[in-house]
Structures are given as C-alpha cells and as structure tokens.
C-alpha cells in the first residue's frame, strides 16, 4: 500500500490524540474523520487542516466512511464495545484497519476477526500502546545486538485502572 489514506473513526480523547500523531509526519493523508458527536468531527477536521492537509470528509456514521472510496485505511478509536463491529466492517470493505485496544470483548470476537482476515486478506493491527514506544524499541534493538546474551524468557507489563 503506497498511499495511506486514513479514515479516523472515534475522536474522543484517545482518538483525537492518535489523530494529532498521524498528521504530524504527513507521510499519510487523513481523508476522513468520523465520530457520533458533530463537535468532535469538526474539531478533528480543523486539526487536519491546521497541519496543512486538505479538509477531510466529515461523518457521524462509520458506515459512510466504509463507502468512501478515498479511504484505504481505518483507525478505530471508538468505545471498546464497538471496536470489533467497526473493524469487521472495514475488513469486509477492503480497508486496512488498526484498532485501539481492547480489540475484543469475547473469544468469539477474536475468531470473527481472524475469519475476516482469512476471507479478505485485509490487514488488521491492534494499536497496543506498549509495543512500539521508544523504550520498547530500545530494548528490542539491544536484544538484536546481543547485549543480553541469549534471551530465553522475558515478561513485562504495566497496570492502570480503566474505570
């Protein structure tokens, strides 16, 4: 995929933060923004314009983003309970999709996502926030350079209250 043309779905706190990140490098184009709240849609569209991109299409229904032929990639940052539904719609629409965590509520959801990938071949990624950060990438590079010797086991994590 040479030209990444993103449709952002979900522009609350986390989604807006991801949108800020996406428009900074300007390697990709944000061509659509979507949220159920019109004020968030307008704020998102204004942010994209502020960083020198064309004003994106603005939607309040994610189904409209799926129909938008200018979009080839979807970022889902909505409420958790809608992640799988929107991700599946994106995959079946042939749009690569990245979903903010949590990716699924039930095991069946996970199987549905795998099945959609197997049927469509559409790329899917969880946007886990502790995989590609500066610290994580630093440790990965240290491992690849052999600074720890042979790594036979590693564990890590963090805890925060999501209430």
Which residues are covered by each model-predicted region?
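N-terminal Rossmann-like dinucleotide-binding module
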Residues: 1-51
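Predominantly a Rossmann-like dinucleotide-binding segment in NAD(P)-dependent oxidoreductases
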Residues: 10-12, 120-125, 130-163
């Amino acid at each position: 995929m040479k030209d990444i043309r993103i449709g952002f779905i979900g522009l609350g706190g986390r989604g807006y933060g991801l949108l800020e990140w996406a428009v900074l490098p300007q390697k990709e184009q944000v061509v659509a923004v979507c949220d159920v709240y019109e004020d968030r849609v307008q704020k998102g569209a204004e942010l994209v314009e502020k960083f020198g991109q064309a004003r994106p299409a603005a939607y309040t229904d994610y189904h409209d983003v799926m129909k938008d032929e200018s979009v080839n990639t979807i970022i889902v940052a909505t409420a958790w309970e809608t992640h799988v539904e929107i991700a599946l719609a994106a995959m079946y629409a042939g749009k690569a999709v990245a979903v903010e965590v949590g990716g699924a509520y039930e095991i069946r959801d996970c199987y549905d996502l795998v099945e959609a990938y197997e049927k469509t071949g559409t790329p899917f990624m969880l946007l886990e926030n502790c995989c590609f950060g500066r610290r994580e990438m630093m440790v990965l590079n240290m491992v690849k350079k052999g600074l720890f010797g042979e790594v036979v086991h590693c564990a890590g994590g963090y805890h925060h209250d999501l209430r």
